[in-house]
């Protein structure tokens, strides 16, 4: 699954266009490397997202094309 779609489906970022912009700005790292929105995300990957001065680090646990709001938190875990 593409990185921008995973971020939207998991609700780490609300909109896919915002996820694209964050990737273009270099604020998202996958396994420690700057990532484009088109990078394929796999189970076990570590994603770091920089929101201003705050950094969120998560590990991908599951990948689904769609999910309910209550189940979105099961797609990742905070590190």
Which residues are covered by each model-predicted region?
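A basic, amphipathic helix-loop patch mediating RNA/tRNA/ribosome contacts
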Residues: 1-41
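C-terminal structural segments of small proteins and small subunits
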Residues: 53-79
């Amino acid at each position: 699954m593409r990185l921008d779609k995973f971020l939207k489906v998991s609700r780490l970022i609300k909109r896919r266009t915002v996820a694209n912009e964050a990737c273009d700005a270099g604020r998202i790292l996958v396994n420690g490397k700057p990532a484009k929105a088109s990078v394929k995300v796999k189970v076990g990957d570590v994603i770091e997202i920089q929101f201003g001065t705050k950094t969120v680090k998560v590990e991908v646990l599951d990948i689904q094309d769609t999910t309910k709001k209550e189940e979105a938190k099961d797609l990742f875990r905070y590190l």
